[in-house]
């Protein structure tokens, strides 16, 4: 009888502890931190490293004969934690697939191979330098960062432009395109 009471107490104690353990796990997950240490006077803000810019739904008629869409999208790269004691100029070089009708125009960014839309390309301009058209593989004129300035915003604009063909060469459909950027402080 004494043994039965000990066994019952042990079973109850074990059962109660297992219920407590089950109640403790009410959700779990993993947090992964990523980043990169760079040798530069400024950091690139986290939301500005990899961006998606929605270009909208653009009428094929607005791109006929090489016309540019009026739907222009701002593109910016926010720099933070700038620590330069002297004024710096930062130049941006964009690289990607050239656009245009022959796919060789470095002043246009070609639509990606998975795009169903055809007959247009993306053009980017440098807002801080007279809206100059950006040429792939060539550094921009540069934007100034003043001594002691902690933040800076590099401003650009992107828009879709027809490749110069008639309306029947502009095929409606979805498109995407990728362009990479590299910063060079001087």
Could you say what each language-model-derived stretch is?
Residues 9-16:
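Bacterial N-terminal signal peptides
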Residues 2-6, 21-186:
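Mature extracellular/passenger domains of Gram-negative fimbrial/pilin and adhesin proteins
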């Amino acid at each position: 009888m004494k043994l039965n009471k000990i066994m019952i107490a042990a079973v109850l104690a074990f059962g109660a502890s297992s219920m407590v353990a089950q109640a403790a796990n009410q959700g779990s997950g993993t947090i992964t931190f990523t980043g990169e240490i760079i040798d530069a006077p400024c950091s690139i803000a986290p939301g500005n490293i990899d961006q998606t810019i929605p270009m909208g739904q653009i009428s094929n008629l607005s791109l006929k004969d090489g016309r540019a869409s009026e739907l222009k999208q701002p593109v910016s790269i926010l720099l933070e934690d700038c620590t330069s004691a002297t004024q710096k100029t930062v130049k941006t070089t964009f690289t990607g697939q050239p656009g245009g009708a022959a796919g060789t125009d470095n002043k246009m960014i070609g639509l990606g191979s998975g795009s169903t839309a055809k007959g247009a390309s993306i053009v980017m301009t440098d807002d801080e330098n007279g809206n100059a058209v950006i040429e792939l593989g060539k550094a921009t004129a540069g934007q100034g960062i003043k001594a002691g300035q902690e933040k800076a915003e590099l401003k650009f604009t992107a828009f879709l432009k027809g490749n110069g063909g008639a309306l029947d060469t502009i095929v409606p459909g979805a498109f995407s395109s990728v362009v990479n950027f590299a910063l060079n402080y001087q």
